[in-house]
Amino acid sequence: MKNDHSVVVANLNGDRNIIRVNIGGAYNIYNAIGCAAALTAFGIDEKTVIDAIEHFNGAFGRMEHFKAGDNTVNLILVKNPAGFSQTMNFLKNIDDDFTLILSLNDNAADGRDISWIWDVDFAGIFEKANVKEIYVTGKRCYDMAVRVKYEGVGNREIKIIENEDYNKLVDIATSQGRDAYIVPTYTSMMAMRPVIAKRLGGKDFWE
C-alpha cells in the first residue's frame, strides 16, 4: 500500500490477478475487491472488471491530493466513526513526517450530534513522532480539540484555526516543509476544497 494507491492480488473465477487500486487506504481495497466480486458474480468478464478498477479515481475530497512544491496536501473526507477510524489507521502507517489538520462541522449534512467523535479509534496515531503538528478547525473545532486532548498527544500543542479560515489552513498546510493531511467532515470539506483548489490547482466539483 502507498499513500495514493495500492497493488493487490485478487482471485477472480480461480484466476490470480494483480490489480492496481488508485486510492490509498485499506478500506478502499475492500471496496474495490467487493465491487470486483459482485461484478464477477453477475458474469462480467475479468478484463472488464480489472480495467474498470484500474481506471477509477476517487471523487473530490476522497483521498484527494494537491501538490504544494515538493510536498502534498491530502484531503480525506470522514463522515462517521468507522470511516474516521479507518483514516486514522491509514495515517498511522505513514512513515514520513506530516502535519495533521482535523475539521469538524455540525451542519445538517454532517449531523447535529457530534458525540460520535468519541467513538473514533485513533489507532495510537499520536504515539508516533512523525505527527509533527496538530491543528483543528471547523464550527466545532473546540469539541474536536477536547477529543484529541483526551486521546493524548504527548507534548504537542493542539492548535486552533478559528472562524473556518481556510486560506489560513492552506497557508499552514503548505508552509511546514512536509506533507499535510486534512481530515474534514462533509460540509467542512465542501467549504474548504474550493479554497484549496484555487490556491493549489485542481478540478472544480463534479469534474
Describe the residue ranges of each PLM region:
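ATP-dependent carboxylate-amine ligase
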Residues: 40-44, 51-60, 65-207
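Generic "edge-of-domain/loop-turn" microfeature
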Residues: 15-17, 26-28, 109, 141
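Generic detection of short hydrophobic beta-strand segments and adjacent strand-loop junctions
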Residues: 17-21, 66
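A conserved, hydrophobic alpha-helical segment in the catalytic core
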Residues: 20-57
